[in-house]
């Protein structure tokens, strides 16, 4: 029963919410939000296992497919689309599927989450393969759209995971790993766009970010595979190259141009002292910059 879920219960701290002044409401929301990180900390081992599966899937030419409805679908879209400019990967490696399609991102279409068939069809339309890793996201742990997608993914032979906000979710049977972020009753009962949605977004950030780090998309703590799509990103790339190599920005921009606007390649050229073609070949063999650099220095 929906009413028995932790996310649907009334929060005893906010039962007189409508009578509180603005400052008191803000203080309580802030206090409740402070508990989110604790719910994530309890799941770090499971999140680590999800990341390991993401890395394996991408290395085997699979995709990471996020599946969600409503807020869960929207946070999935936000996380997935940002991986392209941040880490310079192809669009679709992180693929978000939201119940109701693209229009549901901008306009609430809550009824569309009620159909298992829709989840299955959306996976089929995107040619899901056994190499893909399918991650369902649902606060209640029981959304039919997500169930349809996860059940089909299991049939096909995909590894699967579930990110939810309740204990013992219904969709456990379709999930190899369950990340149960027990954020408890919301400030407004049942409004899972609040703590539950925030927790989901934080975990997706962790999953995509750590996956990309371990696949060589950073050097130290710099996004060296950033895709230069505008002036701001070009300036950032030049600054990254300068901070990593110690060279002045003018020289770094010259190297960036020589490296076809690829910061990682420019850095390797500078730090190794090797020419462009040599460095391109080194990165083909090993995309992890610090490892490629060791190879060239040996």
Curated annotation (Swiss-Prot):
Molecular function (Gene Ontology), one example: carbon-oxygen lyase activity
UniProt-listed PROSITE patterns: GCKR, SIS
Top-level class of the enzyme under EC nomenclature: lyase
Chain ranges passing through the membrane: none
Residue span(s) of domain SIS: 54-217
Residues at the active site: 82, 113
Biological process, per Gene Ontology: amino sugar catabolic process; N-acetylmuramic acid catabolic process; peptidoglycan turnover
Biological pathway: Amino-sugar metabolism; N-acetylmuramate degradation
Keywords: Carbohydrate metabolism, Lyase
EC number: 4.2.1.126
The reaction(s) this protein catalyses: N-acetyl-D-muramate 6-phosphate + H2O = N-acetyl-D-glucosamine 6-phosphate + (R)-lactate
More info: A lyase-type mechanism (elimination/hydration) is suggested for the cleavage of the lactyl ether bond of MurNAc 6-phosphate, with the formation of an alpha,beta-unsaturated aldehyde intermediate with (E)-stereochemistry, followed by the syn addition of water to give product.
Protein family according to the UniProt entry: Belongs to the GCKR-like family. MurNAc-6-P etherase subfamily.
Function description: Specifically catalyzes the cleavage of the D-lactyl ether substituent of MurNAc 6-phosphate, producing GlcNAc 6-phosphate and D-lactate.
Subunit record text: Homodimer.
UniProt-recorded name of the protein: N-acetylmuramic acid 6-phosphate etherase
